Amino acid sequence: MANLRKTHPLLKIANDALVDLPAPSNISVWWNFGSLLGLCLATQILTGLFLAMHYTSDISTAFSSVCHICRDVSYGWLIRNIHANGASFFFICIYMHIARGLYYGSYLYKETWNIGVVLLLLTMMTAFVGYVLPWGQMSFWGATVITNLLSAVPYVGGALVQWIWGGFSVDNATLTRFFAFHFLFPFVIAAATVLHLLFLHETGSNNPAGINSDADKISFHPYFSYKDLLGFVAMLLGLTSLALFAPNLLGDPDNFTPANPLVTPPHIKPEWYFLFAYAILRSIPNKLGGVLALLFSILVLMVVPILHTSKQRGLTFRPLTQFLFWALVADMLILTWIGGMPVEHPFIIIGQIASVIYFTIFLVLSPLAGWAENKALQWA
């Protein structure tokens, strides 16, 4: 049997990725989030599949079908709560995974990093179209506001929006196609994840010290397989606790009201995990400018490897850039808070300042800090 896993064409691939994979001996708990994301994706696909068996993508029955799932389907309430809150845990893991990459310089594996950014965009797109499906007030108005942003595209904007809507407003055609996209995208994400892993295994994992670890590698199984298992238990405990004790904690009360095109909710806002990007979008008074800022708030991650100036890889021994990293974390929390607030004084100016700081840290201060630390090393 020991030989079969090393020789069988299919088992060999699994063996090289999950059993005999050489891994640095000093990788910390921050390296757990990759496998946790895999677990999140599997959970979402599985719960989503069971929800799709009972859901109807028609504006006259969508809201009722979700009610039916929660009331009449065996454990439907649990499946829906796990799916809805699983999305929140998915994004918590994504943001932690990206933060780890930024802190320890994992972005220097450029192919792996860029596929990761594409994965983030795909996941955000999937979550957005999924949020529209229950056809509540916030689903409908969220879809209207976000799809309307495409009208800012010069010359073809108007036609583009109507093409995506499948008509002159968000209607039945929109809901049907969003359901089709929401069903399809997770499998695209799974395929892109395979590519992400393929490129990662070309180089091997980075480690907290940021130095070559070829001299000190250990096998993935049993060491990190059990370490990942501990992460699985912790995350599933958190997810089930949230789904069972406070399933609506992170949702919007407006979504318990069926969609009504004639009544606009007082505050239109996305789910909590998009609030930071929504705050950046709202901080610019110009429509096209806001859309570009929204886009670049994510795409800025792609320029991080290009702007890396330091001679050291991670931030473990770089206090100046460490300060910038934690300033960025604080800034994102402020943006998340502002995204959920009404557009009025003082929230407008706070959002604008936080947005400027967000881009300044990425594009100006981090490269400068790396350069300054190199100079300090020369003087030492």
Swiss-Prot record:
Any Pfam family matching the protein: Cytochrom_B_C
Residues the record lists as binding heme b b566: H97, H196
Residues annotated to bind a ubiquinone: H201
Annotated compartments: Mitochondrion inner membrane
Membrane topology: Multi-pass membrane protein
Record bears the keyword Heme: yes
Lineage top rank: taxon: Eukaryota
Bilayer-spanning residue ranges: 33-53, 77-98, 113-133, 178-198, 226-246, 288-308, 320-340, 347-367
Gene Ontology molecular functions: metal ion binding; ubiquinol-cytochrome-c reductase activity
Keyword annotations of the record: Electron transport, Heme, Iron, Membrane, Metal-binding, Mitochondrion, Mitochondrion inner membrane, Respiratory chain, Transmembrane, Transmembrane helix, Transport, Ubiquinone
Gene Ontology BP terms: mitochondrial electron transport, ubiquinol to cytochrome c
SUPFAM superfamilies in the cross-refs: a domain/subunit of cytochrome bc1 complex (Ubiquinol-cytochrome c reductase), Transmembrane di-heme cytochromes
Binding site for heme b b562: H83, H182
InterPro entries (UniProt xref): Cyt_b/b6_C, Cyt_b/b6_C_sf, Cyt_b/b6_N, Cytb/b6-like_sf, Cytochrome_b, Cytochrome_b_C_euk/bac, Cytochrome_b_N_euk/bac, Di-haem_cyt_TM
Cofactor note: Binds 2 heme b groups non-covalently.
Family: Belongs to the cytochrome b family.
Additional free-text comment from the UniProt record: Heme 1 (or BL or b562) is low-potential and absorbs at about 562 nm, and heme 2 (or BH or b566) is high-potential and absorbs at about 566 nm.
Record-given protein name: Cytochrome b
Organism of derivation: Oncorhynchus keta
Gene of this entry: mt-cyb
